[in-house]
């Protein structure tokens, strides 16, 4: 394949491409805060236009803009999903550099959103530019959808999908989640777990009280902790009534796929600075649990006085936020119903449940044209076959593209992160060399998309498509 000119173009423009990424990363776009969102959306649209895309900006209600861009031609179309919003920064004291400084230190670009996923977005646009400059016309039609609400559960995207099905009809979808593991092996995923993100609240007195009342006034903090303790066992197994019986058995195809996957257990434990895995899992059992195990994670608890100094207070409220990662046959709605019933039967009808966002599970076959193109390109650019996950342990609004309106669109996902990128955490970063290498990888993916045709129908599972929204459930 004649990619010499393409690779040289990327090398010659490496500084320019990197500066484009730095410029985008220096623009805060935390969806949960709302600051700067429209400015970043406009910048993304301008970047698309710069590489020759026709663009449109869509607004759904009061949501942040969805930026759509298209380029190329031909009867075969492929969707590329990305997002311009980023996670909240967290505690600034935990960052070594400013989260929006986009500083490059020892070959690593540090910024909130560099790994998740402004780096992927800029790399894909750079690949389109490089391909058109060196090959000319794109061999397929590419449709970019850039979301502004990924951190909020992408509520606008599901409505957009329902109202614009003609834009979503495609032979495949390329997602923006992926990384190199601790052994520098690229990870390609053919689907994603679903997610249900919930907030649980317990209520006590009208206001916070002096803690002298603690002997006779109910404490909502203890009430919430006691309710949470019924949801999992001390070993981390989800104990919600009826939960495990709703999970589908792992298919023969997925069981076979798991055999080719291994985790660098020692390297990951060093990276995370942990002594052991949950339930002392290891080997194939660890891989199986990581990819096909459901989760219930307490993401945060808030109650009472946690600031500096001493304050003897009896809290009036207590709140916990949980996310459930969902495997085949578990849906967001089902999890909400099971949890409500589980708490009610144990006397916790007073615990309020608010649904903050959700996304369905979606997974597809390795025989689709998009999967084969991505795997082939990865093998070529990285010097060996990638690790192929039948389902990524993370989640996203994949169902909007790969199951909404019965569109049988297969998905393949990859990204520019590495094991130390720490997306969602402090000092989020990518390696600049990985960013530039990814541009070359994407160029080859585009080329191969024009060559490969599906051996299978593609999509194999979409569970519980549902728009992320805020609801209230109280027994």
Regions found by a protein language model. Give the residues of each.
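Flexible glycine/proline-rich, aromatic-decorated loop/lid segments
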Residues: 187-203, 411-418
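Short pre-catalytic strand/loop immediately N-terminal to key active-site residues, enriched for Gly-Thr
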Residues: 105-116, 384-388
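A short core secondary-structure module
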Residues: 214-236
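Acidic, glycine-rich active-site loops and adjacent beta-strand->loop/helix elements
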Residues: 84-86, 145-154, 176-180, 204-207, ...
